[in-house]
Regions:
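A short, exposed loop/beta-hairpin motif centered on an aromatic-Gly-Thr core
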Residues: 23-33
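Short aromatic-glycine-(Arg/Gly/Cys) micro-motifs in beta-strand/loop hairpins
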Residues: 8-22
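Short, charged, surface-exposed hinge/linker loops at domain edges
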Residues: 1-4, 33, 37-69
Length: 69
């Protein structure tokens, strides 16, 4: 399972990370590493909320999850 994080640097020097498979997931950091860590933390939070509310998950994750009936 992989959810790629795209990292880019803003003109002001800050970094931000985006995960295309999870619309709205974007986090900033002072460094590339901080932006990646903040984005990973946000991904986990978003996935947990989706599971909690019975919402759909990205196709790439569904294959790797066991679903309790």
């Amino acid at each position: 399972m992989t959810l790629p994080i795209e990292l880019e640097q803003e003109d002001d020097g800050r970094w931000f990370g985006v995960v295309d498979e999870l619309p709205g997931v974007m986090a900033y950091g002072a460094t590339q590493e901080q932006a990646a860590a903040a984005t990973r933390a946000l991904v986990l939070r978003v996935l947990a909320e989706r599971i909690e509310h019975g919402e759909e998950l990205p196709e790439s994750l569904v294959d790797f999850m066991a679903v309790r009936a």
